[in-house]
C-alpha cells in the first residue's frame, strides 16, 4: 500500500501504455500462437461426421419397430452430444499439422531461404557502407551538414513511398535498365528485376539498404564520437597508418555499437514486409512475412498463424540476444 500511495501518479500514467501493450500486442500474439495449433480441417470433419451419424441412424431406425427406433434415436442423441462436447473442448483440433505442412511446403522453405539471404546480404552491405559514411562524416569537411542531411533523408520517407520510388528504378522500363542500356551493358531485352531468384533478392537488399542506412550511420557516428580523443592522439604519435589505426584501434572500440546495430537490423530485416511485397510480390520471391500475408488472404488462417508464430520466435531470439548483450556490457560498469 505504501508503494501505491507513493507512486500512484506514475502507475496511473503507465496504465494506458500497459493497456495498449496487452490489447494490441500480447493478446494478438497469444491468439496467433493458439490458432497455429488448431487444425482448420477439424470443423469440416466434425460437420461431416455429424451428418453421417444422423443419416445412418435415421436409416437404421426406419428398419425397426417404434420401440427399437426410440432406442436408436436415443443413441443418436447421445452420439451428437458427445461430438458437441468434443468440439467445445479446448483441445479439439489441436495438432502440429500446420507446422508439418509448413516445413513440407516448398514455398515456405524458399521464404525462409530468401529471408535469410536478404538479411545476411543486407547486413554485410549496410555495415560496410554505413561505416564508410560515418567515418567520412566524423571528419571536418566542407559541406558536411548538407551531405549529412542528404544521407538522413530516407529515414523520414514512409516505407511504402520508398518502395514506390524504387519501382521507378527497378521497373523493366526504369532508370537502372536505361542506364545499363546506355552503357552498352544491356541488350534490347530489359532485365526483369522482379522475376524472382537472386535478381529480386538483390533488388530488395538495395532498396532496404537505402531505406535503413541513415539509422546505422547515426549509430556509428555516435560510436565514433564516443571514442576518447586521447586514443586517436596516441595512435598518431605512434605513427600508425590510417588502415592499421582503423582495424586495431577504431574497430575494436566500435564493437558494442556494431553488435547492437547488427542485431537491431537483423530483427528489422526478418520482419521486412512492404518493400518486398510491392517490389517483388508474393509469388516470385516469398519471404516469411509475405508468405504469412499470402496465406491469410487465401483464408488459410491457421497456416498463416503458424508461419507468423515461427517468425515471432525468430525475432524473439534476436531480442533476447540483444537484451543479454546489453546486460553483459552493463555489468562491468555496475
What are these regions (language model features)?
Residues 2-92, 96-334:
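A structural signal for multi-pass alpha-helical bundles of membrane permease subunits
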Amino acid at each position: 500500500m505504501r508503494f501505491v500511495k507513493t507512486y500512484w501518479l506514475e502507475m496511473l500514467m503507465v496504465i494506458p501504455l500497459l493497456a495498449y501493450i496487452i490489447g494490441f500486442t500480447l493478446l494478438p500474439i497469444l491468439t496467433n500462437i493458439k490458432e497455429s495449433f488448431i487444425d482448420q480441417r477439424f470443423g469440416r470433419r466434425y460437420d461431416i461426421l455429424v451428418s453421417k451419424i444422423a443419416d445412418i441412424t435415421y436409416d437404421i431406425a426406419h428398419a425397426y419397430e417404434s420401440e427399437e427406433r426410440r432406442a436408436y434415436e436415443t443413441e443418436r442423441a447421445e452420439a451428437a452430444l458427445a461430438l458437441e462436447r468434443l468440439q467445445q473442448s479446448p483441445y479439439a483440433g489441436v495438432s502440429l499439422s500446420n507446422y508439418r505442412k509448413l516445413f513440407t511446403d516448398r514455398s515456405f522453405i524458399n521464404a525462409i531461404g530468401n529471408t535469410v539471404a536478404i538479411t545476411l546480404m543486407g547486413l554485410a552491405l549496410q555495415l560496410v557502407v554505413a561505416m564508410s559514411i560515418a567515418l567520412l562524416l566524423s571528419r571536418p569537411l566542407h559541406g558536411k551538414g548538407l551531405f549529412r542531411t542528404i544521407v538522413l533523408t530516407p529515414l523520414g520517407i514512409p516505407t511504402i513511398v520508398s518502395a514506390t520510388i524504387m519501382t521507378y528504378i527497378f521497373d523493366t522500363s526504369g532508370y537502372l535498365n536505361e542506364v545499363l542500356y546506355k552503357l552498352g551493358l544491356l541488350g534490347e531485352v530489359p532485365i526483369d528485376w522482379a522475376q524472382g531468384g537472386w535478381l529480386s533478392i538483390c533488388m530488395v537488399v538495395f532498396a532496404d539498404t537505402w531505406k535503413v542506412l541513415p539509422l546505422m550511420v547515426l549509430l556509428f557516428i555516435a560510436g565514433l564520437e564516443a571514442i576518447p580523443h586521447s586514443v586517436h592522439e596516441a595512435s598518431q604519435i605512434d605513427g600508425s597508418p590510417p588502415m592499421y589505426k582503423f582495424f586495431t584501434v577504431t574497430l575494436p572500440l566500435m564493437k558494442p555499437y556494431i553488435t547492437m546495430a547488427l542485431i537491431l537490423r537483423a530483427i528489422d530485416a526478418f520482419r521486412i514486409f512492404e518493400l518486398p511485397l510491392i517490389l517483388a510480390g508474393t509469388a516470385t520471391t516469398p519471404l516469411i512475412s509475405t508468405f504469412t500475408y499470402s496465406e491469410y488472404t487465401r483464408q488459410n488462417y491457421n497456416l498463416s498463424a503458424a508461419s507468423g508464430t515461427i517468425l515471432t520466435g525468430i525475432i524473439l531470439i534476436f531480442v533476447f540476444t540483444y537484451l543479454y548483450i546489453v546486460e553483459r556490457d552493463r555489468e562491468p560498469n555496475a
